[in-house]
Amino acid sequence: MALGLQRARSTTELRKEKSRDAARSRRSQETEVLYQLAHTLPFARGVSAHLDKASIMRLTISYLRMHRLCAAGEWNQVGAGGEPLDACYLKALEGFVMVLTAEGDMAYLSENVSKHLGLSQLELIGHSIFDFIHPCDQEELQDALTPQQTLSRRKVEAPTERCFSLRMKSTLTSRGRTLNLKAATWKVLNCSGHMRAYKPPAQTSPAGSPDSEPPLQCLVLICEAIPHPGSLEPPLGRGAFLSRHSLDMKFTYCDDRIAEVAGYSPDDLIGCSAYEYIHALDSDAVSKSIHTLLSKGQAVTGQYRFLARSGGYLWTQTQATVVSGGRGPQSESIVCVHFLISQVEETGVVLSLEQTEQHSRRPIQRGAPSQKDTPNPGDSLDTPGPRILAFLHPPSLSEAALAADPRRFCSPDLRRLLGPILDGASVAATPSTPLATRHPQSPLSADLPDELPVGTENVHRLFTSGKDTEAVETDLDIAQDADALDLEMLAPYISMDDDFQLNASEQLPRAYHRPLGAVPRPRARSFHGLSPPALEPSLLPRWGSDPRLSCSSPSRGDPSASSPMAGARKRTLAQSSEDEDEGVELLGVRPPKRSPSPEHENFLLFPLSLSFLLTGGPAPGSLQDPSTPLLNLNEPLGLGPSLLSPYSDEDTTQPGGPFQPRAGSAQAD
């Protein structure tokens, strides 16, 4: 028995020993084959000697993919003189080249990837890119790898261009050190390239029939890292300038170079939005870049048109970075580096109100007008653009003098519009006070149309009181009759005297009839007896700009009057004259004292809104050629004529290419 057990054990041990020897031999053979395969790869011998088996297999698969890709028709057509330039390509590029398969595997990366990410070429080739990008960017990359399908039935090629931003892992620090992959940070890369489909060369099967393979889908990208503004050297050159914005893209700082390249002074841009100086056709693309900036921290815009001060535009590209100066979102700001691609083009084309001096939305300079800019008596005002309906109130003239000849203080468009009204009122108006010795700053000659323009009846209805004051009071009293109202169902009364949204067109009285025996309710006047303060000539208020000057605002009643609404009006009637004076002081301009003469009411204007002041189109009674183009650009006129070029008499020029400025129009103001 013992001898049998010993023989069985010896046989088992011999088998195990033979199995271990066979496994050791197979592993040695595999290692030898893998190292031979590693030396076959196009790497330096010192690099391939330190590769493990998994890396050798990964790099071999990637090499076979690139070999098939390079054997395709388009890749195989390489000029004889192209090889010496391969080393210069990487030096000229500010990024690295990356080739992705349809599954997202990195088939190839250029050698200079380590300068931008800190990871070597061998560490990335063959891996899936989804393991190295931010989780929030994986869906965007998957959409870029998917071929876009066209919905048209015609055979139209799908767009192959791709441009997006990715956040990849980077082991580089700001001081140039390399960290571990577990401590890597995110770095924003601007990726641009094309989706390619290459047909491999046809191969013949053993049966003799050609074996066709599906085309190879790959995404060829150039990835450029966006530099941080703090790493830029101070001299940016004449073709670039720096600016800082708030999170809503309003200028908080701008470099002085903006005056040389675009004609703006830094003070003109402070507080203005950057969107106001971008061409309307490029605003959508810039808005997408700003959205990427706020979500990823850095972004690079495409080539867009930045509007110049005196007309025209400059082709520009911007690198933007969100910089945090402390804790909280309020301490964040956006620093932009603008690179100019061209000089000023199309200098005669005005594309925005910011490019005109008279329609500029920047704050007015508070100071005395210079002797050169002060108009002289007899000068005319030429406004070829949007109509300007303005009525100035010189402080040196009395109310009676203004009422006697109001057309002297109207713009030409306003005189044409109010011509029939002013003619009819000037016959009845008699000045009670002689004219002051001081003449107005801009007297204008009257130019009235012979016929009644269209819409004058509506203007007469808005600008004049068609009924007497007593008739208006009668209608309001009837509307508030106690027999027709249920006081328990009424909301508390709130005074609307200070509501700036009310105007004369919304306060027209309704057609009620006053019953017999009704007692009229006493009314307070719309104008209170306050003398106007002395104002500077540059700060003349516009008539109708103060809602308290509206002749149609509801007036307060007398607390002693017997009114059915006395219980609901206690809070309004309890206001003192001191509160009213405080409201006037908050406005900054005290309304002038109104003359008790009823014949002056024909010259009071209702509150003009901004849309009414900037109404586009020709003035009533004027002729305009409908074939005269506003702009010589192939773009929709959705912005309206009031926001486009107001110069219809100048010869427009055809816009040049974005990178070929014409001679004569390439000088910046």
Curated annotation (Swiss-Prot):
In normoxia, hydroxylated on Pro-492 in the oxygen-dependent degradation domain (ODD) by prolyl hydroxylase(s) (PHD). The hydroxylated proline promotes interaction with VHL, initiating rapid ubiquitination and subsequent proteasomal degradation. Ubiquitinated; ubiquitination occurs in a VHL- and oxygen-dependent pathway and subsequently targeted for proteasomal degradation. Gene3D superfamilies: Helix-loop-helix DNA-binding domain, PAS domain. Residues 454-506 are annotated as: NTAD. It comes from the Eukaryota. Keywords: Angiogenesis, Apoptosis, Cytoplasm, Developmental protein, Hydroxylation, Isopeptide bond, Mitochondrion, Nucleus, Repeat, Repressor, Stress response, Transcription, Transcription regulation, Tumor suppressor, Ubl conjugation. Isoform 2 interacts (via ODD domain) with VHL (via beta domain). Isoform 4 interacts with HIF1A; the interaction inhibits the binding of HIF1A to hypoxia-responsive element (HRE) and HIF1A/ARNT-dependent transcriptional activation. Isoform 4 interacts with ARNT; the interaction occurs in a HIF1A- and DNA-binding-independent manner and does not induce HIF1A/ARNT-dependent transcriptional activation. Isoform 4 interacts with EPAS1. Interacts with BAD, BCL2L2 and MCL1. This is Hypoxia-inducible factor 3-alpha. It comes from Homo sapiens (Human). The gene is HIF3A.
